[in-house]
């Protein structure tokens, strides 16, 4: 693997471009500070992203901060908010204690947990998807998104048309069901409640929201119905305990209820998905399971010549990620997406726009061939590409010239002049090749 020496925590300069190897993969985690359009390394990383075909994403709470949802570990994150809220009742070492499965041993902690989760749920209900969420949806629209693995529990992706793994997947025909998933929720879904006994999930209701707001976890209606049915039939109640409803999220110290399914799906993505780029956004990668996910994807992507990048404002520990993550871009995720829009605008065209542009180019090519055939048939010399582009009418071909003018007008609306798409580069290359084999004239050279 060709290596690039990691830069110190300072911005790279364009003068490095002459020393850059052909491969952008690194043996040690390298840092890119800020979003400088003149940064040669950043420019090349961006270009490789635009050319990738199967992109995997891993997201954390950092991509939802601009939607008004706090992250976990920052100075104003969820852990600190919980710690401040609880300080008037008792002293806790970390807000993380309120997200540990052991809290269900203490009725008082359950009450605080219920109140806090209802506040977070209400906050999520008002939140709107960020630019980063929409970027992930755009990857799907371009048929470039392999899968998005998210640690977030807000489910904002669903509101922009992405399919979430918030329901249990059938074990039969697993691969076809997994293929239709856009987002895999690694830590559960705040928008549903689950029973602690029968594990049935339910959408929130106003009544249950009021219960949690009072610090109470409601009883499971399915468990109650089963017990009442057995009592009416004169049968034993099988332990009699009724489950309680809690937010359907994964707490520290408990396993994901769909852990085996997610592992099976990840292996399917690695073996058959052929990922060639991994974008990690808005996470400091502290959770062990997430670390393993990144390492597995990294090996496959590096074997295929791809890159792994992390976009996050907070630095991560370097030594544990050498040879796994190539670059950390120190930036807000939404700002990075805005930077991409300015650097690779064609990448952000919709699939429909691209199809229309290709169709117009094919039609224009067919019309040029028709014009050439008609001119050859009447013994006139072929018109140079420059004159055709200028729309110079030749007697008997007015109708064809009018069609070409119309096509060029529509094309300009779809593809703005300032954008330099790969398709334009190919077309310009073809034009230059044709020019090499044609005699040049003084007035054409002056043009």
From Swiss-Prot:
Keywords: Cytoplasm, Metal-binding, NAD, Nucleus, Repressor, Transcription, Transcription regulation, Transferase, Zinc. It catalyses: N(6)-acetyl-L-lysyl-[protein] + NAD(+) + H2O = 2''-O-acetyl-ADP-D-ribose + nicotinamide + L-lysyl-[protein]. GO terms for molecular function: histone deacetylase activity, NAD-dependent; metal ion binding; NAD+ binding. Its EC number is 2.3.1.286. Present with 319 molecules/cell in log phase SD medium. This is NAD-dependent histone deacetylase HST3. Its cofactor is Zn(2+). Residues 1-21, 365-393, 411-447 are annotated as: Disordered. Its main location: cytoplasm. Binds 1 zinc ion per subunit. Pfam families: SIR2. It is an enzyme of class 2 (transferase). One of its GO terms (cellular component) is chromosome, telomeric region. Residues 365-375 have a biased composition (Basic and acidic residues). It is found in: Cytoplasm; Nucleus. It comes from Saccharomyces cerevisiae (strain ATCC 204508 / S288c). NAD-dependent histone deacetylase, which contributes together with HST4 to histone H3 'Lys-56' deacetylation, regulation of telomeric silencing, proper cell cycle progression, DNA damage control, DNA recombination, and genomic maintenance. Zn(2+) binds at residues 195, 198, 220, 223. Residues 35-363 form the Deacetylase sirtuin-type domain. GO terms for biological process: DNA-templated transcription; mRNA transcription; rDNA heterochromatin formation; replication-born double-strand break repair via sister chromatid exchange; short-chain fatty acid metabolic process; subtelomeric heterochromatin formation. The keyword Nucleotide-binding does not apply. Belongs to the sirtuin family. Class I subfamily.
